[in-house]
Amino acid sequence: MTCSDSSWTVGGGNDWCTITKVSNTSAKVSVKANTSDFRSTGVVCVNGSNVATISVTQEVLLDRSKLVTAYKQITNSSCAATCAAMCVNKSPETLKNDGIDLEYAMWSTIATKYGYKSTGPDSTSLKSIYNTLKSGYPVIVQVNTGSMEHWVVVTKYSGNSTTLSADDFTCIDPWDAKTKVLSSSTRYSAPNKAVVFKKS
């Protein structure tokens, strides 16, 4: 895109970079890139004595949703096992038929049975979840504490790479098998524990 007036012009823009004129003295440059990409943004002043104020926002897109299959839990207390089922791409019914007790989070048993390795549950944070997504894996996250605990699978992050917000993470909630913002997941208060499944 290009915007201009009689004094100066802001030009540029493609699928990863958007340059927007804010006023006669400022412009906003937004950059979005996958974690494997490197982007650099610069400002060039041609035939002018003054350079406008430029603010640059670095955004990152991490998407691991293709590694999991969404499923709805088949009992009120099988959210954790259903999250594990999503990460090994098996239905909860398949796990049950294979002798897995869905009422308990048998992480290592489920992982080993279907050719995966599991780590956790370990204490977690938004930064830790972000780093795991960046490493290439979805994250099973306990979103609260107490007797009514609930687990979801975090699959995606899209936002600023330095200021993390639960509003910028996307998860699959086994309560209804819907994709939603992490902060809107069932019983969400804050990330508490995390489990990661990796293909053996």
Question: Which residue stretches match the model-derived regions?
Answer:
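A short beta-strand micro-motif common to beta-rich folds, especially ectodomain repeats
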Residues: 37-48
